Amino acid sequence: CDAPTHYCTNYWECCSGYCEHSHCW
């Protein structure tokens, strides 16, 4: 994704919402 809000802990996913247990919600 272009401009992620933050990254998840272990998998470095693009997150635009919450990070729960190392994946995006």
Swiss-Prot record:
Localization annotation: Secreted
UniProt GO cellular component terms: extracellular region
Superkingdom per UniProt: Eukaryota
Tissues of expression: Expressed by the venom duct.
Residue(s) carrying 4-carboxyglutamate: 13, 20
Alphabetical keyword list: Calcium channel impairing toxin, Disulfide bond, Gamma-carboxyglutamic acid, Hydroxylation, Ion channel impairing toxin, Knottin, Neurotoxin, Secreted, Toxin
Residue numbers bearing the 4-hydroxyproline modification: 4
Disulfide linkage: 1-15, 8-19, 14-24
Claim: Magnesium is one of the keywords in the record: no
Gene Ontology molecular functions: calcium channel regulator activity; toxin activity
Record bears the keyword Disulfide bond: yes
Anything else known: Negative results: does not modify sodium, potassium and acid sensing ionic channel (ASIC) currents.
Domain notes: The presence of a 'disulfide through disulfide knot' structurally defines this protein as a knottin. The cysteine framework is VI/VII (C-C-CC-C-C).
Task performed by this protein: Micromolar concentrations of PiVIIA increase the magnitude of the macroscopic calcium current in DRG neurons from rat. An increase, even modest of the calcium current, may have a significant impact in the excitability and electrical activity of neurons, and may set up PiVIIA as a member of the pharmacological family of the gamma-conotoxins.
Family: Belongs to the conotoxin O2 superfamily.
Name under which the protein is recorded: Gamma-conotoxin PiVIIA
